[in-house]
């Protein structure tokens, strides 16, 4: 374990010394708790930099998908992966590649048409012509196929799709370079960019060694665990073609793909999950424009359960259990009969029922504001001091 010194920017003197491992763990925990970008590994970032002769990559945008030279920018576009699954769960590779090709061309056109916030950003963006094509709803695809998000098969599938997207985008960029010429900054960086392309090619073939000028070896494509051999074969062939075309014509764009969080556009695109992320909650509360909320379940849950072999009846029961019935009538455990046995009259039960649609948790319904303080103290026998405790749980008090 080594110490890490923090130095003052004013005079470069040591301000504090911290254990490096402890500091790393604190940063990792903070990134995990906040779900915001954490540490950026500068060495690896610059080892895969396509234009190192034009300067180092020093930072990223706030969401951390775009890493390139200072004073550059890229337009973003994302594809909804779920739209490429057919009814049998087979991924439509040719349609996906067509969409990637079409959007790569569209984004290239947008470089010329875009407006930038400063002269420097405009000039450098025209010079390097970076693009930002990505995808969303990976979690939805995995759910639809009944695959655990944290599994070797899921990682292999995600790696294959990403390799196909990036390889196809760079291949399209090389084809555009044949017609339009390479980006202006390519000549100064040709050998380095081709080196990066060859490293991508090796990774797509699942090769574990032989990489060029990398400080840390990458995790190559897991060919054996990919559930669809057509995906890995396509990833390999498209990267072979990309490298060959790049040798002949160069590339129209210094970068072509990023994977953004898609927190906003993912909703517009009707995605069940955003970016590469799993679903943060299978059941969510949707706020209504006229007031109030209603519960919705991820639409992929029934499809995932069917893929896992559950019968239609079992799927229906599981969905009802997850979403809830919206009423205590006939519910297991906490129902009208059980409440009447505890002293609840019909008026109190009606007040509970009226509060259920807006409740995020059933515990939030059982409180003195819904039932009335007098009812809680005189009928249910709850001491006033107990009722005023911040962590008081009425359901536990009632024996549920």
Question: Where would I find each of the regions flagged by the language model?
Answer:
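Long, C-terminal-biased catalytic regions of enzyme "large/alpha" subunits
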Residues: 1-400
């Amino acid at each position: 374990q080594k110490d890490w010194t923090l130095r003052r920017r004013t005079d470069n003197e040591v301000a504090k010394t911290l254990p490096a491992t402890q500091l790393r763990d604190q940063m990792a925990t903070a990134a995990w708790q906040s779900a915001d970008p954490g540490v950026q590994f500068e060495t690896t970032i610059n080892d895969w930099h396509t234009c190192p002769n034009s300067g180092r990559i020093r930072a990223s945008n706030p969401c951390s998908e775009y890493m390139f030279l200072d004073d550059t920018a890229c337009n973003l576009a994302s594809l909804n992966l779920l739209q490429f699954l057919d009814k049998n769960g087979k991924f439509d590779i040719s349609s996906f590649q067509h969409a990637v090709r079409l959007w790569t061309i569209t984004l290239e056109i947008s470089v010329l048409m875009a407006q930038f916030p400063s002269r420097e950003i405009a000039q450098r963006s025209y010079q390097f012509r970076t693009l930002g094509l990505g995808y969303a709803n990976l979690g939805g695809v995995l759910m639809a196929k009944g695959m655990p998000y944290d599994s070797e098969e899921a990682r292999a599938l995600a790696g294959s799709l990403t390799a196909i997207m990036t390889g196809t985008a760079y291949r399209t960029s090389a084809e555009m370079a044949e017609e339009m010429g390479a980006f202006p900054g390519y000549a100064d960086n040709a050998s380095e960019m081709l080196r990066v392309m060859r490293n991508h090619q090796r990774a797509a073939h699942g090769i574990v060694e032989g990489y060029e000028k990398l400080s840390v070896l990458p995790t190559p494509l897991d060919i054996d665990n990919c559930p669809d051999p057509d995906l890995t074969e396509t990833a390999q062939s498209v990267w072979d073609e990309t490298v060959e075309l790049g040798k002949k014509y160069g590339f129209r764009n210094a970068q072509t793909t990023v994977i953004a969080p898609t927190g906003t556009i993912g909703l517009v695109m009707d995605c069940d999950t955003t970016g590469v992320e799993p679903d943060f909650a299978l059941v969510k509360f949707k706020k209504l424009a006229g007031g109030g909320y209603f519960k919705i379940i991820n639409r992929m849950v029934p499809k995932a359960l069917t893929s896992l072999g559950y019968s239609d009846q079992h799927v229906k029961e599981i969905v009802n259990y997850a979403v809830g019935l919206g009423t205590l009538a006939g519910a297991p455990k906490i129902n009208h009969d059980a409440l009447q046995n505890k002293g609840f009259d019909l008026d109190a039960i009606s007040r509970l029922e009226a509060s259920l649609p807006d409740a995020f948790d059933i515990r939030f319904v059982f409180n003195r504001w819904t039932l009335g303080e007098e009812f809680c103290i005189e009928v249910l026998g709850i001491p006033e001091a107990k009722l005023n405790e911040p962590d008081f749980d009425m359901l536990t008090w009632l024996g549920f």
